[in-house]
């Protein structure tokens, strides 16, 4: 999913296993985005990847974006941002989230079984990050 310009908003929902999600909201304005996933091995690409504080927040979103941050790359570039990620009772789901500039947020959740990974990089402006994880073997890395 690629969303350009002005008032932006997006909802991505995946039910099932072995899906791959990628989304970008670029070039500003009001942004938004909700990601709701139920199922296993989404964005997993047969593990292992990430690790150690979600691989140091996916190497600071691949060094502020020579791009490549993969494993369910979700990117908001500029303006008011926000993002909600919900993963429900699932295993082995991987997300790399980048908010580059403006008012930022990101909420999280990821509840249920385990081995889920999230890399969160918020580079520039007002930032925030709330996250809950439940289960075992989960990994979260945040860089601001």
Language model: regions and residue ranges:
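Low-complexity repeat regions of mature extracellularly deployed or surface/particle-associated proteins
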Residues: 1-144
